[in-house]
Amino acid sequence: MRDEVESPEELLGLARSGPVALLVVGDPMQATTHIDLEDRCVDEGIGFHVIPGLTATALAVSLSGLQSYRFGRQVTIPFSVGEYLPTSPLQMIRDNRDSGLHTLVLLDLDPTGMGVEEPRPMVPGEAVALLERMSQRSEGD
C-alpha cells in the first residue's frame, strides 16, 4: 500500500468518484507522504478529513517521565550502507544536549537503505557502534 500512497494517482482517482478511506497507524500528519496527499487533495478540490492518532514517539516521550517541552529534535540512527554514514544524527544529539534538551533517538528498521528486504530493528549496541563511527568521522572532517 505504501507505493499507492507515495504515487497516489489511483487513490485520488477513486476519491474523485466516491468516498475513500485510508487507515494508518499513529498520526498520519507526521509523515511527509500523508502531508503530500493532503496537499494534492486541496489542489484538486477533493474533500478529506484527518483523524489524528497516538504516535509511538508521543507515547515514548510520555512514558519516559520526562517533560515533553524539554525535548529537542528527534533523531533517527540509520544503518550504514556501503560508505554511507551521515554524521548529522550525532550533531543533532549534540545540539540538543548543548541546548539542555533531551533527544528521542529512533533506531532504523531498514538495513538496506532501500526497503528491499524485510525490516530488521536495529539493536542498541549497533546504534552505539554507529554513533562511535559518526564521532570518529566528524572528528576527521
Predicted regions and their residues:
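Short, flexible loop segments at the rims of nucleotide/cofactor-binding pockets, characterized by
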Residues: 1-3, 26-27, 80-83
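Glycine-rich, highly charged phosphate/nucleotide-binding loops
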Residues: 1-11
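A short acidic, glycine/proline-enriched capping/turn motif at secondary-structure boundaries
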Residues: 4-5, 27-30, 56-57
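Beta-strand/loop-alpha-helix module characteristic of Rossmann-like adenine-cofactor folds
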Residues: 10-12, 16-21, 32, 39, ...
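Glycine-rich beta-strand-to-loop/alpha-helix junction loops that act as flexible
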Residues: 24-27, 52
